Regions:
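ATP-dependent adenylate-forming carboxylate-activation enzymes
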Residues: 47, 88-100, 141, 157-177, ...
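AMP-binding/adenylate-forming domain of the ANL superfamily
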Residues: 2-85, 89-119, 217-221, 261-264
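Conserved coil-to-alpha-helix start sites within the AMP-binding
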Residues: 70-84, 97, 138-155, 167, ...
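Conserved AMP-binding/adenylation subdomain of ANL enzymes
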Residues: 111-112, 116-134, 142-183
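Generic structural signal for small/hydrophobic residues in well-ordered secondary structure
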Residues: 32, 66, 140, 145, ...
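AMP-dependent adenylate-forming
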Residues: 6-13, 98-108, 232-235, 251-357
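Gly/Ser/Thr-rich phosphate-binding loop
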Residues: 149, 154-157, 184-186, 196-254, ...
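Flexible acidic/glycine-rich loop/turn elements at helix↔coil and beta-strand↔loop transitions
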Residues: 30-38, 129, 275-276, 320-325
Length: 357
């Protein structure tokens, strides 16, 4: 392996651009204080919390119950704010035996804001924030929910959180999207793929679909664009050990991604050696939003062999680099198994760029 190739695999391709001027948790929260008090901050089922009610809880006030999900989500937001003040690690977030620093959650929220701003529903008012409605189909007690809520508050948007029934019943999910009229929808591939098996109404308000996880079915993009003409789609690679998204790419079935700012992705063999472009290996993840080990020996965490005093986590994903710097994840076919017609599954060796590697 040449010196240039090695540099690309360890540094140029492996690292997202350096993080710059990431707002703190308190700064993100304070942005929401200028939003009209009666605007809905978060909704789940028949329950809502307005900006006034949510910020009253953040300030230590007492408000009436808003349902178990929103009450718990508000408590989680308060815990994040409190941890940020003293620099504590959030054991509530992250995998077992690890936790997240508030700055990691803030960095993930800042990335989410940048993605949402790429497809605004209307010009953003500097005083009153955004009129976006962002729908998230996941549990309240996940890092994704915390990140999405922080990003929505900072932008003055409304977050709609799906119920357990809506996540598992595609007809209920389609109805939720139609009724809540979101501008952005964030969910895993299986949840959105199920929309193919119901008579879904037109969903013209959705401007962007973000599919997270490690499943990138080719047919899903066409399905979502048919439901929302003029919308765009994106694939976001995530792992439990990393706050928010680690890498992004097109939702085209190839599984190709590049690390987001602050993230680090390496492809290594069983002996922790670099895998050359055109070959497949295990994906290791590190960077600014990596979870911290609470007991010093959490399973899957290893030293970065190329950066002193840095840690990586061994993910469940496999993939390889193309000759032009895309990381191609080996595509998981769970959405295909669910029944969506797809093209032939993609192998990392079939993607343009490997032949030239």
């Amino acid at each position: 392996m040449s010196t240039v190739e090695r540099y690309r695999l360890v540094d140029e391709w492996a690292n997202g651009v350096e993080l710059y001027d990431v707002p703190s948790v308190s700064c993100l929260i304070d942005c929401g204080r200028r939003v009209p008090a009666l605007r809905t901050a978060v909704r789940c089922g028949d329950h809502i919390l307005t900006y006034a009610e949510l910020y009253e809880r953040l300030d230590g006030g007492v408000t009436g119950p808003a349902g178990p999900t929103l009450d718990d989500l508000a408590r989680l937001l308060c815990a994040i704010a409190a941890a940020a003040e003293i620099g504590a690690v959030l054991a509530e977030l992250g995998p077992e035996g690890a936790g997240l620093k508030p700055v990691a959650v803030a960095a993930a929220a800042d990335d989410r804001r940048a993605v949402a701003a790429d497809q605004p529903s209307c010009p953003i008012d500097r005083a009153y924030g955004s009129a976006d409605v962002r729908l998230l189909a996941t549990r309240w007690d996940t890092t994704d929910a915390a990140v999405e809520l922080l990003a929505a508050l900072a932008d003055g948007a409304t977050l709609v959180l799906s119920t357990a029934t809506q996540r598992t019943d595609p007809a209920a999910l389609a109805e939720l999207i139609a009724v809540s009229a979101p501008t952005h929808v964030v969910a895993d591939a299986d949840t959105l793929a199920a929309l193919a098996f119901v008579t879904a109404p037109a969903l013209p308000t959705v401007r962007r679909w973000d599919v997270f996880g490690n499943d990138c079915p080719a047919a899903l993009s066409a399905l979502l664009r048919d439901l929302s003409p003029g919308s765009c789609t994106g694939f976001a690679y995530t792992a439990p050990e990393y706050a928010g998204v680690a890498a992004r790419g097109p939702l085209d079935g190839s599984g190709r991604v590049r690390p987001i700012p602050g993230a680090r992705l390496l492809v290594l063999d069983e002996d922790m050696n670099l895998v050359a472009p055109g070959q497949s290996g295990r994906v290791y993840l590190g960077g600014a939003a990596l979870a911290l080990e609470l007991d010093g020996a959490t399973e899957g965490f290893v030293d970065d062999p190329f950066v002193p005093d840095s840690r990586l986590v061994r993910t469940d994903a496999f993939g390889g680099w193309t000759a032009d710097g895309w990381l191609v994840l080996e595509v998981i076919e769970s959405a295909s198994v669910a029944g969506i017609p797809t093209a032939t599954p993609v192998s990392v060796l079939d993607v343009d760029g490997y032949a030239a590697a």
